[in-house]
């Protein structure tokens, strides 16, 4: 045990040195250089060293600044006006809504169209054209899982960024009910950079609580999102219910007030199971929890009718409940940034990206692009 801790400390210390002393990086073999966490900050290294590997950040540490005023950042149609009290609620709690974007019967039609569309291969990330590599090749489904590792990886990519090959989905995120409310929080200019479908099958487990800001978790080495100021609000996520989302069928949950700062993960052991009875995540023999004290009264289930959406900051601890029903729950989310935010590094765009959490690597981003959904892009940082 002591030897393992010493080796871990030594490995992290050497990694830190190589990241800080940049001229040494030119001497490293490419294979080793590609494994270095070049995006880690001093605080990230010191946290894992001081805790001897028991605490680790999986996103860049930051603290959300409160604005000098809670007035809307731009004027909008009065039908979509947010009050100062609502904007203050968002900053204090990390979410706002739900709001209606389309009628339930319209949402049902959109869902049917999109479910049919998802049966086709993505033209943005076509697996048949080697647009990415699935690391997990097993197709067997274990007793306590809905899908095999292979299917989980494939579906995660096939459900990603379909707004780029489906105009009906893109139009949903251009709806003024969504854009006008986001503009009051972010500013008049908005870019959609990522969408993802979130179907939850009958009996499917919930998603453990987690945080995100710059999406360093994608590859655990470098962020995906580069805003001018990490501590400002620079991104919003809109989660749209295509079917009713209830506590019974696996609605989202947000822990209010946890948007104030990004926290490290706590890693403890030993454990033998993959899933605990308290909803925390286990990897092998390690138990993973976010290092934030969660009070049960702060865990807010976000129940919605089909055709409603809510806006939240992924800095907030968020996840979803298990689907205890016999019906599927369908939803789609979109991540929206200001145009002064850079997305993906030049290396990621040229050589490919990784999505570790679903076991995918070498993602070709040639067909990916941002979409201006409101205002103008005065920076031109992104393709």
PLM ranges: what are they?
Residues 2-18, 57-75, 120, 264-272, ...:
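Non-heme Fe(II)/2-oxoglutarate
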Residues 2-92, 99-221, 359:
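Non-heme Fe(II)-dependent double-stranded beta-helix
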Residues 165-171, 225-226, 288-300, 319-321:
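Active-site rim elements
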Residues 185, 218-247, 303-306, 311, ...:
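Short, conserved beta-strand element in jelly-roll/cupin
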Residues 195-197, 202, 241, 257, ...:
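Short, well-ordered beta-to-alpha junction loops that form the rim of enzyme active sites
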Residues 196, 211-213, 236-244, 256:
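Short, structured patches in soluble enzyme cores that scaffold and shape functional sites
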Residues 204-211, 218-221, 248-257, 263-267, ...:
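A short secondary-structure junction signal
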Residues 232-235, 245-317:
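Double-stranded beta-helix
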């Amino acid at each position: 045990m002591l030897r393992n801790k010493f080796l871990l400390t030594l490995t992290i210390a050497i990694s830190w040195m190589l990241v800080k002393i940049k001229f040494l990086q030119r001497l490293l073999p490419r294979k080793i250089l590609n494994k270095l966490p070049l995006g880690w900050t001093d605080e990230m290294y010191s946290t894992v060293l001081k805790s001897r590997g028991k605490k680790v950040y999986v996103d860049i540490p930051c603290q959300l600044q409160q604005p000098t005023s809670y007035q809307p950042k731009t004027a909008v149609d009065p039908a979509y006006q947010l009050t100062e009290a609502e904007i203050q609620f968002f900053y204090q709690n990390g979410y706002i809504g739900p709001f209606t974007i389309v009628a339930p019967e319209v949402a049902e039609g959109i869902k049917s169209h999109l479910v049919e569309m998802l049966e086709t291969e993505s033209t943005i990330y076509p697996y048949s054209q080697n647009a990415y590599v699935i690391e997990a090749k097993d197709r067997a489904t274990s007793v306590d899982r809905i899908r095999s590792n292979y299917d989980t990886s494939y579906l995660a990519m096939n459900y990603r960024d379909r707004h780029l090959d489906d105009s009906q989905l893109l139009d949903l995120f251009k709806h003024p009910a969504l854009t006008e409310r986001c503009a009051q929080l972010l500013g008049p200019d908005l870019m959609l950079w990522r969408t993802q479908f979130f179907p939850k099958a009958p009996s499917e487990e919930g998603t453990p609580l987690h945080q995100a800001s710059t999406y360093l978790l994608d590859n655990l080495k470098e962020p995906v999102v580069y805003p001018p100021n990490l501590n400002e609000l620079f991104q919003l996520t809109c989660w749209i219910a295509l079917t009713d989302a209830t506590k019974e069928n696996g609605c989202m949950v947000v822990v209010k007030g946890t948007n104030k700062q990004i926290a490290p993960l706590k890693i403890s052991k030993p454990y033998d199971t993959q899933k605990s009875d308290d909803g925390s995540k286990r990897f092998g023999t390690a138990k993973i929890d976010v290092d934030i004290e969660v009070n049960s009264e702060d865990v807010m289930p976000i129940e919605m009718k089909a055709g409603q959406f809510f806006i939240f900051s992924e800095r907030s601890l968020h996840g979803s409940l298990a689907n205890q029903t016999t019906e599927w729950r369908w939803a789609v989310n979109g991540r929206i940034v200001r145009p002064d935010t850079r997305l993906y590094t030049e290396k990621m765009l040229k050589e490919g990206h990784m999505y570790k959490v679903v076991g995918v690597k070498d993602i070709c981003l040639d067909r990916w692009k941002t979409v201006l959904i409101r205002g103008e892009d005065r920076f031109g940082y992104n393709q």
